Design a protein with these regions (language model features):
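Short, basic-rich loop-to-helix N-cap that marks the start of a DNA-contacting helix
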Residues: 40-56
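Key DNA-contact positions within bacterial/archaeal DNA-binding proteins
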Residues: 19, 30, 63
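Residue-level detection of the helix-turn-helix DNA-binding "recognition helix"
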Residues: 12, 26, 37, 70
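Short, charged recognition helix plus adjacent turn
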Residues: 34, 56, 63-72
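Short, basic interhelical loop/turn and adjoining N-cap
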Residues: 27-33
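A short, Lys/Arg-rich alpha-helix, primarily the initiator
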Residues: 1-24
Length: 72
């Protein structure tokens, strides 16, 4: 599962728009579209501080957001 897949999963499970997601984590909606799009040129990583913010805001594991696996 890619970073784009994980972010799209969070957005889908929260039943919110990408605009709402971007507002709640404090980044531009364009950046969220870049991260979640299907382009081969999309970013494949995000800064740990953004992953932590997403984890706190939406209740997901920070490690899962960053790497696709949870720390046991």
């Amino acid at each position: 599962m890619t970073l784009a897949d994980r972010l799209n999963q969070i957005i889908d499970e929260q039943n919110i728009s990408k605009a709402e997601f971007s507002r709640r984590v404090g980044v531009s909606v364009n950046y969220i579209y870049q991260l979640t799009g299907s382009s081969e040129k999309r970013p494949t990583t995000i800064h740990q501080s953004l992953a932590k913010l997403i984890a706190l805001e939406f209740g997901y594991d920070e490690n899962w957001i960053l790497h696709g696996k949870k720390v046991e």
